[in-house]
Regions:
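A short, structured loop/turn motif at beta-sheet edges
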Residues: 82-89, 114-119, 148, 153, ...
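Extended, loop-rich substrate-binding clefts of extracytoplasmic carbohydrate-active enzymes
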Residues: 65-117
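Beta-strand-rich interaction surfaces with strong enrichment in secreted/lumenal proteins
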Residues: 110-112, 269-274
Length: 290
C-alpha cells in the first residue's frame, strides 16, 4: 500500500488495480467506502479497456471474437509504481501475454493521483505502443460514504447535479443498455434525493455530457464531497437492497453495449481511438468539502 498526504488529506492506494483505498481528512474522517465484501468488495476501481458490459461478454475485432469481464481487467491486475513525490503517485500497466489473450493491443496505461489542497486529481494516461490503431474505454468508479448512513440501514442520500433535468439511460438488459428506454430525472434546482430504489434497475446513467459535476450533500445540505469531470458519460450507483451506506459517482469515457449489439469493437458507442504512438490523457477531480 502506498500513501501520500498533505496538510488536509491522506490517500492510500493499492498497486492491485492502482485502486484508491482511503481518503481521510486532517481529522481522520474517512470519505471512501471500506470495501466490506458483504456489501461491495471494492473502493474505487479503474475501468479499462471497457466500461460496463459487453453483450454476452463478447466483442469483435476484424470479425474475431474476444471476451472481457464487466469493466475490463485493469481493476484486477497488478500495476507497477513508477513515480512518487510528496504529492503525487503514478502506477503503470503495460500489456503482456495475459492481457493480449483478450485485448490484442500493445499499450501503456498510467494512473496518477495528485494532491492539491483539498482536491485529488485522478489522472488517466493511455499510450498506444502498437503499430496499429487501438480502441479503448476508460472510467472511474469511486464509492463515497453518505453522511448519516450506516451499514445495514437503508441508504438515502441527497445529491446536487449541475443539470436540473438530465435524461437518463437504462443499463438493465443483460447488463447492457436499452436504447429505447430514457427518462428525464426531475430535480429541485439540481437537488436530487436518491435511495436504494433509485438504483433498482442498476446505475442511473447520463450521457452526452449532460452532467459535469456531482456533489453528495451532508445532513445540513452542504457539499460533503464533489466530483468534477469532463467525461461524456457518468453513472450513479448503489447496490440496491444491500443497505450499503455509499454512492458511487462514476465518470466514464465509454458505456455498455447497446442490448443486442453484434457489431465491431470500433463501432461501440463512446469508443476512443488512438493512432500508433499517440496518447490520451484526462482527469477527474475529487474535492473534499466538509
Amino acid at each position: 500500500m502506498e500513501q501520500i498526504k498533505n496538510d488536509q488529506l491522506t490517500l492510500e492506494i493499492s498497486s492491485l488495480g492502482a485502486e484508491l483505498q482511503s481518503i481521510k481528512d486532517a481529522n481522520g474522517n474517512e470519505y471512501l467506502w471500506d470495501g466490506d465484501e458483504k456489501y461491495w468488495n471494492r473502493h474505487s476501481p479503474i475501468l479499462f479497456p471497457i466500461v460496463c458490459g459487453l453483450w454476452k461478454d463478447t466483442y469483435r475485432i476484424d470479425g474475431k471474437e474476444y471476451t472481457l469481464p464487466r469493466h475490463g481487467f485493469a481493476r484486477d491486475t497488478e500495476f507497477k509504481l513508477v513515480g512518487k513525490t510528496a504529492d503525487r503517485l503514478t502506477f503503470a500497466l503495460i500489456d503482456n501475454e495475459e492481457t493480449q489473450k483478450n485485448y490484442p493491443y500493445h499499450f501503456n496505461l498510467a494512473i496518477s493521483y495528485r494532491l492539491e489542497g483539498n482536491e485529488i486529481h485522478v489522472i488517466w494516461h493511455v499510450e498506444n505502443t502498437d503499430d496499429k490503431e487501438i480502441m479503448f474505454q476508460i472510467g472511474g468508479h469511486p464509492a463515497f460514504l453518505v453522511p448519516g448512513c450506516k451499514k445495514g440501514e437503508e441508504m438515502k442520500a441527497t445529491l446536487k447535479l449541475d443539470n436540473e433535468a438530465p435524461v437518463r439511460l437504462y443499463g438493465n438488459v443483460g447488463g447492457c443498455i436499452d436504447r429505447q428506454a430514457k427518462e428525464t430525472v426531475e430535480t429541485e434546482k439540481g437537488i436530487w434525493e436518491v435511495n436504494e430504489e433509485t438504483f433498482a434497475e442498476d446505475a442511473v446513467i447520463f450521457d452526452k455530457s449532460q452532467v459535469k459535476q456531482v456533489s453528495i450533500l451532508n445532513e445540513q445540505g452542504e457539499p460533503h464531497v464533489t466530483l468534477e469531470f469532463k467525461t461524456p458519460a457518468v453513472g450513479i450507483w448503489n447496490p440496491t437492497g444491500k443497505h450499503a451506506p455509499f454512492v458511487c459517482i462514476e465518470p466514464w469515457y465509454g458505456l455498455s453495449d447497446w442490448a443486442e449489439f453484434d457489431g465491431e469493437f470500433k463501432d461501440k458507442y463512446l469508443m476512443n481511438r488512438l493512432q500508433p504512438g499517440a496518447s490520451f490523457m484526462s482527469e477527474y477531480i475529487i474535492r473534499i468539502e466538509k
